[in-house]
Amino acid sequence: MADFIKHFVVVGGSLAGLFTGIMLSRLSHDVTILERTPAEALAGQGAGIIVHSIVPPIIEATVKLIGSLSPIVDFLEEYDCTHTISYVSLGKCGIQYLKRDGTILNTAVPVGLKELGSASWDLLYNVLRANFDGVYATSYVEAVAREEGGGKAVYLSGARLTSIQDLRHEGVKVDYESSNGSNSSLIADFVVGADGPRSTVRKLLLPQVERTYAGYVAWRGTVKESLVSEETRILLKSKIWTVFHRRGH
């Protein structure tokens, strides 16, 4: 078993990094997650997350690959030991296409979709954090004991990756800077890049790859219902997904 156990360094401690870290740890591997953002600055990342696939091609591909409409729900059922209610079912909602003036152009319900589940980044993050290292807890997510046989799990906040060096048969050397300015190193068998669109891993390993403009800008945020008009509340309440039609924004 000792020869089988590997040390993974996951760069990026948001949802993708935690999904990866939990799975590897439950397979008895040792995992260290490096998250460059300090813990206190992570709260409130993202207004909302739909936990089911809603785009027809993605639905078809997901069902064909894993037989599910929600890999997130499946993952939580398999790995969540906190038994926290992680999403709210919104029923069989559809997608609203709006014109620029706010009127509804069309409403569609993806074929095969039985329900939509809504969660928040904060909720999913806290549930995953509690499941990763067994010492994290919040007012609504309890700490859980580590499962027997699981690998070591370490989550380092404020740890900024600075370099990656292939040591060949000796592994991979990972250098990082802590929030207090000190420099440290880790030796890993594998390094996983899960550090988002501004990936330092990609910048270090594939410096020739540059981000390209997709042709649009997405903005999202939250607003209190009391601050919007009654007409807007009704429009947004009737369907969970509202998108502007092409050439309409």
Residues of each region from the PLM?
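Glycine-rich FAD pyrophosphate-binding loop
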Residues: V9-G13, I22-A47, E60, K64
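N-terminal Rossmann-fold NAD(P) dinucleotide-binding loop
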Residues: G17-L18
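Solvent-exposed strand-loop boundary residues in beta-sheet-rich modules
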Residues: T37, D101, S178-N180
